[in-house]
Amino acid sequence: CLLIESDRGLILVDTGFGTREVAMPGRRIAPFFRALNNPQLRPEETAIAQIQRLGFKPADVRHIVISHLDFDHAGGIEDFPHATIHITAREKEVADERRGGAFVGTRRYRPQQWDEAENWSLYPMGGGEPWMGFDAVRDLQGLSPEILLVPLAGHTWGHSGVAIDTGRGWLFYAADAYFYRGEIGAERYDCPPGLRGYQRMMEVDRTARLANQQRIRDLALQQQGEVRIFCAHDAREFELLSGIEKSSTGAPSVRELEFA
């Protein structure tokens, strides 16, 4: 998860598992993924608990930007009932209908994780002024202009990254567009076989996923020092990026929260 402190309140990017996954994992996570991933569901690692430890209240989270609605990214949505949820319309549509692959579609998407949420802002898959050569959605409703949605279809039909202008350069959260730093940050592609297989199992469009991964790789090489890229599931990237300090320019302050 990513927590952004802005003049418009706290903005949470993805939510990880929430308190209800901790309390009722059998109802909230498909047995297949509980067995495969063996998630360690600890109350203290939920986004709401980490935010409270930072001295904030849950109601301080005014907005949630969701990359996609997979079970491990959307579980905490209902811990923040007053927040507005920002997501592509395509992702909301396919998640509600549980269309995310012949085998995993009904398992990856758990509508009970968001069916109580009332405040949604839905966006097209791009169409705004490009960002670094990528389609982008700018002017997210109620959010600072420094925060953009960047569509990255392939892992899911409506999957997006999130770009944040910190005032000292860009952060680019690529979510599940890749899983391991060696996929984008090395001269030669490198990814552990297990993660490679997991990505293939979860993808809905291999051509789009690999094309977007290559574009992220190109961005990493071309914009070194200007854009810091990270994904949702690489622990080493988390270690390097956690605890980014507030910019002296007044741009949004960004912190990483560890996924439960």
Regions found by a protein language model. Give the residues of each.
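Catalytic core of the metallo-beta-lactamase
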Residues: C1-P25, F56-A59, D79-H82, L122-G185
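Pre-active-site segment of Zn-dependent metallo-hydrolases
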Residues: G9-H63
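Active-site flanking residues adjacent to catalytic metal/cofactor-binding acidic residues
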Residues: V13, S67, I87-T88, Y173-D176, ...
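Cap/insert and terminal regions of metallo-dependent hydrolase folds
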Residues: T19, R34-A49, R168-A260
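Metallo-beta-lactamase
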Residues: N37-F56, D60-D72, A89-P151, R196, ...
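Short, conserved loop/helix-junction motifs that constitute active-site signature segments
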Residues: E78-P81, Q113-D115
